[in-house]
Amino acid sequence: MTVSCPPPSTSEREEQARALCLRLLTARSRTRAELAGQLAKRGYPEDIGNRVLDRLAAVGLVDDTDFAEQWVQSRRANAAKSKRALAAELHAKGVDDDVITTVLGGIDAGAERGRAEKLVRARLRREVLIDDGTDEARVSRRLVAMLARRGYGQTLACEVVIAELAAERERRRV
């Protein structure tokens, strides 16, 4: 004869959900939406998830604004992503649009252009440019594609690549 165990009480389920969230937050900071998704995936009711997440937010363990600021700082430094790419990543992580706008508001267009120029310059140093310019179109396509993968707009990418290619040709000529 099989004896079925009663389901854990609400407070037990809440404690299990809290423990899961704390375990997930140990590895890296997460957004409220990411934690809610993990709780739902594991079968926790929405009301329990909301109570647990509200408690964690009250003590400062879940803060989407802080997460977004850290994410932007890290991704701009390590991956050289553009504002557009960062906004898409934050949106995919469930950060509110108002928070995204606020966090990305501190990045000006000049800084973004400067970062694109730095990326192109670094890549151009490793490129072999033939003096007759036959492979310049190939190099140009590669550089524009590199910037596009990082979320830079086509107009900005083309302008930066043309200017940096001209500067690199001049530098190598001297």
From Swiss-Prot:
Gene Ontology cellular component list: cytoplasm; plasma membrane
Iron-sulfur keyword on record: no
Keywords from the UniProt entry: Cytoplasm
Keyword Ribosomal protein: no
Main location: cytoplasm
Subcellular location(s) per record: Cytoplasm
Entries under InterPro entries matching the protein: RecX_HTH_1st, RecX_HTH_2nd, Regulatory_RecX, WH-like_DNA-bd_sf
Gene Ontology biological process terms from the UniProt entry: regulation of DNA repair
Stored Gene3D superfamilies: Winged helix-like DNA-binding domain superfamily/Winged helix DNA-binding domain
Role played: Binds to RecA inhibiting ATP hydrolysis and the generation of heteroduplex DNA. It might act as an anti-recombinase to quell inappropriate recombinational repair during normal DNA metabolism. It is essential for cell survival.
PANTHER family reported for this sequence: REGULATORY PROTEIN RECX FAMILY PROTEIN
Family affiliation: Belongs to the RecX family.
Protein name per the record: Regulatory protein RecX
Lineage: Bacteria, Bacillati, Actinomycetota, Actinomycetes, Mycobacteriales
Gene name as annotated: recX
